[in-house]
Amino acid sequence: MSQEINQKSQEVRVRFAPSPTGYLHVGGARTALFNWLFARKNNGKFVLRIEDTDTERSTRESEQMIMNDLKWLGLYWDEGPDIGGNYGPYRQSERLEIYKKYAYELVEKGYAYFAIYDENDPKKVIEKTTKEPKTKNPFTVVFKVPENKVIAFDDMLKGRIEFSTEHMEDFIILKSNGYSVYNYAVVIDDHFMNITHVLRGEDHISNTPKQLLLYEAFGWEQPKFMHIPLILGADKTPLSKRHGATAVEHFRKEGYLPKALVNYLAILGWSVDEEIFDYTQKVQSFMPEQISNKNVVFDYQKLEWVNGKHMRTLSLDELMKYFKEWQEFTEKKFEIPEKVIEISREKVNTLKQLYEFTLPFVDDNYEYSNDYIEKFLKKPEAIHILELGMKKFSDLNDYTIENVEKVLREIAIELNLGTNKVFQTIRGAVLGRLVTPGLFESIAVLGKEKTLSRIRRTIGMISTIGG
């Protein structure tokens, strides 16, 4: 075996190996994160490998989407299909000759055999042989499972795990189309890419005995395994589309910050001393044994709360940068002034909410909420509040927060009305809704021209709604 590496390098090498059959799931992103943290903590290498042997479902578009999402999350790799490395190729579809060579070697050693199938019935085996078939019939390479053998390994998280081969059947390692099956390819790849630690979801535990049999047959040192508990939905079943969005791309479009999403994924099962943090500052604190051995539930509300905390720790310049980048996902693109962002950020938890919250400041064709119309605009005093507001704001030239507050309180006093009724009537008139940033700050930001034109517009609305 000319390519064989006889001893594992002392350098820690981990890999994230997605199948490019769709989007990057938050469960996959968390697995990538734990691998990334482990590599960085140990000054090792984080490898991206694309497992694209499912020829019917794998696409380069999905591969690119996954890489884009990982980059957006900040989980950059040291070796991979786009940047290369010393252990490539990093796509399984480009490693077929390697798989064939070592599958045939297993046959030569007596650990596997060729299964030849009926030409008209691809499931019917007509011959098993250790000689390479010269027939036109389809054939596979099948690994021979030893009888009544106990297979064991020490999981970094779960401790000793044992399996028996008593109920295991021989399994295909090389398909008739020349492509490898998962359990075989992953062993070949992890060995020749010198992977030292395999951190993956616990749904892979059932794959481990087949992989260990292959390591033993080749006489190769196996990596250390850690199987991470799964992310569940609220009903305690594995997280899926049934529970809501699961794609990293969805959360990106919904206006979540990358560091906030990574922060939340990190605390899903990792016991740390604080809930809000920058994951890049937690590298030295990462210890696999601190990961919970229990499945964890994905809480969408908690994620939104974490995101809001991150949004409020950003400088205004940083928030504006993220906000402008996020606007590529919007149909209406407006230049939102910094001052509007500044007075709005405390009331929202996502960039999308920030956009929706600030839109009335720049979109003069804003709609009035039903709440505002029913609770305030249809009331008989609304016209008096708005007409007096027009007069007083017309007389005001210096739109400071203090002056705006003074005008609004004068309206309440002169009309002998409660401040809430006056404030909410004016708030809805200038912004179309009842939940906004501070009213005094909002009018100060809008300025004289916009404030007056919006009150005038609302007065015109009253006759059309029967107020």
UniProtKB/Swiss-Prot annotation:
A motif ('KMSKS' region) lies at residues 238-242. Signal peptide: none annotated. GO terms for cellular component: cytosol. Keywords: Aminoacyl-tRNA synthetase, ATP-binding, Cytoplasm, Ligase, Nucleotide-binding, Protein biosynthesis. ATP binds at residue 241. It catalyses: tRNA(Glu) + L-glutamate + ATP = L-glutamyl-tRNA(Glu) + AMP + diphosphate. CDD domains: GluRS_core (cd00808). GO terms for molecular function: ATP binding; glutamate-tRNA ligase activity; tRNA binding; zinc ion binding. It is found in: Cytoplasm. Belongs to the class-I aminoacyl-tRNA synthetase family. Glutamate--tRNA ligase type 1 subfamily. HAMAP family: Glu_tRNA_synth_type1 (MF_00022). Catalyzes the attachment of glutamate to tRNA(Glu) in a two-step reaction: glutamate is first activated by ATP to form Glu-AMP and then transferred to the acceptor end of tRNA(Glu). This is Glutamate--tRNA ligase 2. The gene is gltX2.
